[in-house]
Amino acid sequence: MAEKITTRSADYSQWYIDLVRSAKLADYSDVRGCMVIRPNGYAIWEKMQTALDRMFKETGHVNAYFPLFIPESFIAKEAEHIEGFAPECAVVTHGGGEELAEKLYVRPTSETIIWSSYKKWIQSYRDLPILINQWANVVRWEMRTRLFLRTTEFLWQEGHTAHATPEESQEEVVRMINVYKTFAENYMALPVIIGKKTDSEKFAGAVDTWCIEAMMQDSKALQAGTSHNLGQNFAKAFDCQFQTRDGKLDYVWATSWGVSTRLIGALIMAHSDDRGLVLPPKLATRQVVIIPILKGDKAAVCEKAHAISRTLSANGIPAFVDDSEQNSPGWKFAEYELQGIPLRIELGPRDIQNGTCIVARRDTLEKTELALDDTLSVSISEILNAIQQNLFDRALEFRNEHTFEASSYSEFREMVENGFVIAHWDGTAETEAKIKEETKATIRVLPEEPDYISRYAMHEAGTCIYSGNPAAQKAVFAKAY
């Protein structure tokens, strides 16, 4: 029988761990803080990679690969950067049986090693822009880990671009955060808010950090992607100058942006239920499972099931048949619900006789009878599209229902236990830190989306809910992963 998982209402954190392990997405490693991504989990990452890689290339980016090891002298060149990452770094001190002359850092992120190459490649405005993405692993020495959400080693992509003007680099920052939003909403069925981080939350070494923030089913926030305007900070650190069109020397303008396997954690927590994983069809490697009810003429039922599978697959709908006899249909139903297969077709002798089959949706658990004729592929495709849309609509409705507006600090403290809170903030790091200390809530995002700004009057002046000082804007606060 499919493994029993803790319910969300009983213990949300344990539910998440149970689901990840029972659905065979990932497991703990013998290396502290690291995880093993199992085939079911890696298949989701591959689907994400495929979609994102296509989107990156459509916006003019190309892939490259840079070293895993970064000399200590490179890391030290950008003071703010090293200050932000030093506590998380893994450091190699010995190699080949000898102590190294210079320590090597295992990349926590690649700005420094990449900019050491960009300095060699860029001499003139004709060499710009450089639009490079890297698919890689990174290491950040986490003390408190959770599968997919926070691990010592994780997989990601990191884009690193170089530009001739600040306007071009800012356009790149906004372009790529919008690529992430499109991916999150169209593929993950995950509504997100685009905006900026506060100075205390931005990337170490960045001028500005833009992000997409999502709400999970426990009403906590999860940062799903970031895009950083690095200004000329890294170019200055590596003395990367270029000759401008008018013959002058200037430092290059830079951006970096990335998402990671953390997105799989977001996907799980946004959509899944007490039965197991719920996957948006666009990120499901296997969209349809066909389960023959093996009574009577087993051979005829299996033959029809495989014929349906071939037809669906030929029409771009990845399908497979489970006609194994060691487990009952009921066991299979539960197992494939646990694995998050979006659609199940049940097929028995009577169904074949009637020219119909039963189709069960994973998102709503509703069952429908469909005709076994030339319209089947179209009908299945329509249901898969409906599942994709329903997951997005359901998540958006949940976010809207759990977004509150606070006009006092007492109101704020109560509301922040149940979702996002929009409240006036005086713009100071002191107030931000005090609120975090007292409530564990942080400013997740300063929204930049016109619709969101308008809906919640984000730029309306008022009084800070904590300090009572004048506030020029509102911020979105939440507890977060």
UniProtKB/Swiss-Prot annotation:
Its main location: cytoplasm. Pfam families: HGTP_anticodon, ProRS-C_1, tRNA-synt_2b. GO terms for molecular function: ATP binding; proline-tRNA ligase activity. The gene is proS. Homodimer. Keywords: Aminoacyl-tRNA synthetase, ATP-binding, Cytoplasm, Ligase, Nucleotide-binding, Protein biosynthesis. PROSITE patterns: AA_TRNA_LIGASE_II. It is an enzyme of class 6 (ligase). Consists of three domains: the N-terminal catalytic domain, the anticodon-binding domain and the C-terminal extension. GO terms for cellular component: aminoacyl-tRNA synthetase multienzyme complex; cytoplasm. This is Proline--tRNA ligase. It catalyses: tRNA(Pro) + L-proline + ATP = L-prolyl-tRNA(Pro) + AMP + diphosphate. One of its GO terms (biological process) is prolyl-tRNA aminoacylation. It comes from Chlorobium phaeobacteroides (strain DSM 266 / SMG 266 / 2430).
